[in-house]
Every structure is written in C-alpha cells, then in structure tokens.
C-alpha cells in the first residue's frame, strides 16, 4: 500500500497539521523523515519496521548508517535522512540542556546524561564541564569502550577542561549490564582523576555510574 492509498486521517503529515507534532507516534515521525515507501509497502510499514528493530527508541541515535540499511526498504538515502534528523535533535538538545543549568546535586547532572547513557551497549565515558557558579558550559563523551585506567587517562579529560576554562568537572560512565555498582577499575580511574584535578586546580565534583534508570554517585558513597 502506497502513501497515496492511506486514508487522510492516517497520513502523518495531515495528522501533524490537524493535531500537532505531539500526536504522532515514533513510527509516524520516522515516516515523515523518510517520506516514501516502496512499490509494495507503505512508508508507515517501513517506518514501523525501523522502530521495531530497536528495543528502545533512544538506541536509534547510536545506530550506524549500515545498521539502518539492514532494514528492508531502507537505502543509503533514507538512512542518511534518519541520521541527519537524529543528529540535529541531539545538537539542539545539548545546547538547550546546557543553557544556564546549575548543578546543585547529582540528580541535576543525571537528568542531563541519563537519556544518552542508560541504554548503550558499550561503555561511554562522559564529562560535564562547569564554571565557578557550577553552571554547565560544555559536555562531551571522551572515551568509548571498556573503562580502565589505561584508556581513561586524566590528560585527555583535563586537556579539554582547561580548553573550556572549567572550574570543575563531573564524570559519568554507563554500565551496559544495568548494574551501576562500581568496579575496582572504576575506583582506580576516579582516584587518578581526583589526584590530577588537585594538581591542576580543577575539582572533580563527582564520578557517577549510570545503570538502567538508576545510578550511583561515587562522591555520595564516600569513595573519594
């Protein structure tokens, strides 16, 4: 069934115009992005297949162009459109979330990073950079892969902190298992970051481990 054969009330574009963007399902949003179906399938059928490929819609932001192309009906053009839309949304989210946000407690910081880190399949080491008022001035993923002291080097973290004229930093990484209990390597990395920060004069306010909808603050738990 082609898009032209879908009833007016079911077409994503018409639904958006009549009821607003919030009324659209995730599949309908994807359908608007990829625009067309194939000879044998409607755009909504293909869009729904994309959504079903991922356990959580947030996982789409980490998919490669090749992964999208594994979906029947998706070629390089459609895959590129999806990735461009996701990247634009990510950039808008980062800028919006950083504007005049003050970190007063671990919860404030976790609200910024939980949507990005909670559902990843690999460990990501992420940093928030703060000014003297504890306002977020920048944030970035520094390392991807298993967290250990040989990979997460304080030099890389504090080089960026100095470049951004940071007064303090907060570090985060996710545990793909969903269990945020710190490992011995997590504690060793934290110890090295604290020591380096003390020498440079940039405080490590916290190192937070993100699990599935839960977290552990190493500072609150007294690990440093």
Swiss-Prot record:
GO terms for biological process: proteolysis. It holds the Pfam family RadC. NCBIfam families: PRK00024.1, radc. Belongs to the UPF0758 family. The keyword Protease applies. This is UPF0758 protein lwe1562. Zn(2+) binds at residues 173, 175, 186. CDD domains: MPN_DUF2466 (cd08071). Keywords: Hydrolase, Metal-binding, Metalloprotease, Protease, Zinc. A motif (JAMM motif) lies at residues 173-186. Residues 102-224 form the MPN domain. PANTHER family: DNA REPAIR PROTEIN RADC, UPF0758 PROTEIN YEES-RELATED. GO terms for molecular function: metal ion binding; metallopeptidase activity.
